[in-house]
């Protein structure tokens, strides 16, 4: 059973005397180690299968672990409790619902259901949903629950008017759920903790049942998961936590990397084992990752190594702009294809979703098959399709398809019945739906479109986009949500202005009709959707857990990666560095780090310095490809020294600038 394990992995499998922390670097075989440890406990008679609780973070990871166990111990694997935290919480609720005041047929609400409840409460309490955005409140309730903050606790900290309203809604929300015999997704963690704290005998029963607790990806645990882990393991103290503090990149979801850093404080007698041998990457790639992450202060000291050999140097390219950056990727992909490399072995990583747009356009021009993982194709994203529908309606008011898409987007109180009646009326009088509008809220919508029509004749395309985002309410709706998802969608809408700006610079003053024709030619990606052999485009957050032979990381600039929002906070900058570590360690054989001297992003041109993360890698690991003569002939070279001259500069509000201490902003 221990065959094929290295000495550190064997040590981790064989140690079962008390708390164990396994710090497993990227590609160090942690899943294999964890699975073998479970099998060893059972095969050696140290535990019955039902005495083992293994927690993973995704259903996919749980299935993979279960399948591996089947391969080692056969049908006994069926009796091992392998699940996510939420699945385990649900099991506890089903077995103890009465003690928490629920009936057997309690309902689990999904995020859409809980949002519907919050919307109704906001309306019933008489609050303006434009000020007290239901989605923002729903997300805040979720955060509160993950931080173990009940309505009673939250009330103590509610000072502002908004927080007091938030407390009232939270309180009513909990009352409504209990009254309807319902729980939400976050309750699957919160209620088991409540159950254990209020019923010591129930806690003792589960502590005696689960004598060995193993938790994967411990660096990603939030407060509720951390407390649940401590409660269930308090008696046996035979808890094994596996993770890598250097890969903790989900703080925006409530994950607290300090849980793994504080493990030895929580369990004074804990043993720590480092898994540092990497089976994925070349030593050059690992040396680069080690050199970057060592600049973080909040970390466990470890050093990844491999017996694979040095491999190729890391390729660095400083492009002229984002278009040149994408074209570099295209050139290198073509070279790889000439060496019989398959598209599916290639990944392009970026910090924000909006960066995929230029890459997608260039790949479409070259007929290169690609897939966007963890998101939609840029032109398929809902907010982009909504914006294009507005533009099409402004251009052609007879476009019923576009009108039906946006007449109540964002919501403006025009219901399905009204729309149905309008459609019938238009059919009866033989006209477009737009022309059939004559009263009500739909007439206000029509007036907005008419105003935008007039403006379209005097504004540039980029200026028109800004007016559409404001007049339609799209920008206000997303800004009021105060969620990460809304922030990403807003970034995508702002990035659309880069398309119009680029189009205007290339073609001069153009009509809305010409622009709509242009994007209709580049937004169709259906041809390759069923082909598994495609290049993978994704954010660094989406790539965790994956690996590719050839990896391109684009946008390696200050303000992009690391992200502008992180530059003023040490903790956030360290998370950006962990993200960079994750990006680097996805590459098996071949890594390209790319940036641009100038970049048009969100409709604004930026001149960004090279990312500090590139500067943290020893130059002897890097093969540089920066050739001034390769700059596009029609564009001027930038004298970067101008950025640092001691003379007055005419700055305007909205300009992006670089400061030696504060970075880009």
Please give the residue ranges for each predicted region:
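Conserved RecA-like ASCE P-loop NTPase motor core of nucleic-acid helicases/translocases
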Residues: 47-59, 80-82, 216, 242, ...
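Conserved helicase NTPase motor core
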Residues: 3-14, 18-22, 53-54, 61-62, ...
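Conserved helicase C-terminal RecA-like lobe
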Residues: 159, 342, 356-368, 381, ...
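Inter-lobe coupling/hinge region of RecA-like P-loop helicase motors
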Residues: 2-6, 10-24, 50, 100-107, ...
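P-loop NTPase Walker
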Residues: 1-104, 108, 115, 204, ...
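ATP-hydrolysis module of ASCE/P-loop NTPase motor domains
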Residues: 16, 77-80, 98-187, 210, ...
